[in-house]
Design a protein with these regions (language model features):
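N-terminal cap/leader regions of alpha/beta-hydrolase-fold enzymes
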Residues: 1-118
């Protein structure tokens, strides 16, 4: 649920959002007319998406549709699948927490924020 809200928020107030991150986000790409990925042309933000292995297995085309949408909007976005990490891998007290994957994801997040917001 969090991943879609980063896009919805950035599309609602694009002048106030310069960077967004989605870690183990789901439902970023749907067949519905209100799919978050369809709002990407409204954004002015750089993005980082860390996708869990099992989320990628459920929607193997989602990452490609995200890349296509960001490319068409001329916006920078890095999109990666975290092999071996399951949905929720960044939640430190969660059942599928993966410390190595979480630290890598947080490093990408901090790098993006430093690049765009500082």
């Amino acid at each position: 649920m969090g991943g879609p809200y980063t896009i919805l928020t950035a599309a609602a107030v694009p002048e106030r959002v310069a960077a967004g991150v989605s870690l183990h986000g789901a439902n970023l790409v749907t067949d519905k007319p209100d799919s978050p990925h369809l709002l990407i042309p409204k954004l002015k933000a750089s993005y980082y998406f860390g996708i869990a292995t099992n989320d990628d297995q459920r929607q193997p085309d989602a990452k490609d549709k995200l890349r296509e949408a960001f490319t068409a909007a001329h916006l920078p976005a890095k999109i990666e699948v975290y092999d071996g990490c399951q949905h929720g891998w960044c939640v430190s007290d969660g059942m599928v927490y993966n410390k190595v994957g979480a630290e890598r994801a947080y490093d990408h997040e901090i790098t993006l924020y430093k690049k765009v917001l500082v």
